[in-house]
Swiss-Prot record:
<feature type="region of interest" description="Flexible loop">
    <location>
        <begin position="96"/>
        <end position="106"/>
    </location>
</feature>
<dbReference type="GO" id="GO:0006730">
    <property type="term" value="P:one-carbon metabolic process"/>
</dbReference>
<feature type="binding site" description="in other chain">
    <location>
        <position position="12"/>
    </location>
    <ligand>
        <name>ATP</name>
    </ligand>
</feature>
<comment type="subunit">
    <text>Homotetramer; dimer of dimers.</text>
</comment>
<feature type="binding site" description="in other chain">
    <location>
        <begin position="257"/>
        <end position="258"/>
    </location>
    <ligand>
        <name>ATP</name>
    </ligand>
</feature>
<dbReference type="GO" id="GO:0006556">
    <property type="term" value="P:S-adenosylmethionine biosynthetic process"/>
</dbReference>
<dbReference type="InterPro" id="IPR022631">
    <property type="entry name" value="ADOMET_SYNTHASE_CS"/>
</dbReference>
<protein>
    <recommendedName>
        <fullName>S-adenosylmethionine synthase</fullName>
        <ecNumber>2.5.1.6</ecNumber>
    </recommendedName>
</protein>
<feature type="binding site">
    <location>
        <position position="251"/>
    </location>
    <ligand>
        <name>L-methionine</name>
    </ligand>
</feature>
<feature type="binding site" description="in other chain">
    <location>
        <begin position="242"/>
        <end position="243"/>
    </location>
    <ligand>
        <name>ATP</name>
    </ligand>
</feature>
<feature type="binding site" description="in other chain">
    <location>
        <position position="96"/>
    </location>
    <ligand>
        <name>L-methionine</name>
    </ligand>
</feature>
<dbReference type="GO" id="GO:0005524">
    <property type="term" value="F:ATP binding"/>
</dbReference>
<feature type="binding site">
    <location>
        <position position="40"/>
    </location>
    <ligand>
        <name>K(+)</name>
    </ligand>
</feature>
<dbReference type="Pfam" id="PF02772">
    <property type="entry name" value="S-AdoMet_synt_M"/>
</dbReference>
<feature type="binding site">
    <location>
        <position position="278"/>
    </location>
    <ligand>
        <name>ATP</name>
    </ligand>
</feature>
<dbReference type="InterPro" id="IPR022630">
    <property type="entry name" value="S-AdoMet_synt_C"/>
</dbReference>
<dbReference type="GO" id="GO:0005737">
    <property type="term" value="C:cytoplasm"/>
</dbReference>
Amino acid sequence: MILTSESVTEGHPDKLCDQISDAILDGVICKDKNARAGIETIAGNGVVHVFGEVSNPDSVDIPGIIRKTILDIGYTSEDAGIDGNTCSIQESITSQSKEIADAVNFSLEYRNQQGDLGRNSFSQQGSGDQGSVFGYACRETPEMMPLPITIAHKLAYSLAFVRKEKILPYLLPDGKSQVTLGYDSANRPKTLETVVISAQHEDSVDLDKLRFDILERVVRPVISATGLDCSKATFLINPAGRFVTGGPSADSGLTGRKIVVDTYGCAAKHGGGALSGKDPSKLDRFASYMARWVAKHVVAADFAESIEVQISYAIGKAHPVAFNIDTHGTSTIALDKLKCAILKVFDFRPAAVIDSLDLKRPIYQKTAAYGHFGRDIFTWERICPDKLNALLGAV
């Protein structure tokens, strides 16, 4: 089996937009932890346009947040792709629809007087939308992430690191990585097949020097730690040639266009909804994190070598309408028994998820580059001993 996954640097135009959307979201949550927001960003040709819905749009300095985000990434000149100091900023922010707000605030169960409906009941809040999400975990890395996307993220992060630390001072913010691995008959990663790096750079740098420097300073340190067989690997560094014009001046950016980069690469399914710019009442956010949290606990309990968790919701309903798991033939117990144990131990109602994972905090800009999963700075990446013991006991 061959598996390929890609990542992008924080200066990629789409990732720039993800970070702007989530930086604004963090600012909104700082002012009101119960705020509702759905923020989209477009960037291109020296213009940044943010639009969407926010429950308290006047509470934050949106232009100031946008400029700081752009500058912190490293876009300080139009020659690099955009200048955070001088770019044009346009806003089209409105309040959330009352109908949507009511559906979230007063669930179908609450309106029909079903279930536990006491004060502050988790059944009162409904899902902010319909849809399905997928969570995944496996034994390929200590982080329980697929190895191809893990390596791709490390390469992309390393590109930004050597740029910011001026180890390779001629690099500019835009960049991408891609990793192809070969798997053995037991579906374990075995060989490194191909690495692709595309790095934006200043016009003055020699292309051969750039290729050598990136191979030695970025690629080899990351790859050497994997233990993969690299004897037949192909390394393609800036295979298209020079990459001087980059960032939003070369390709327009848009929030939500790197959803596979954000999750598990090509190793798992994706429900199609983007995460960035959305407050935790949105199912693409709370349910995606919950699905990952559950998947990690199943693998940590040694009930499966890998698992994909699917959760589906209806707008305005607190309880999921469907739940499914796939252990790819690696489960150590019957799937029906495992599924029942998961549903017994974990509460999938939106308010319960938000409470369990402490999601009403300004944590979201950090998620918007180098993956939402695989980093233990996030609550959904941490194994809860009580939940793990309960899961073990439930089977």
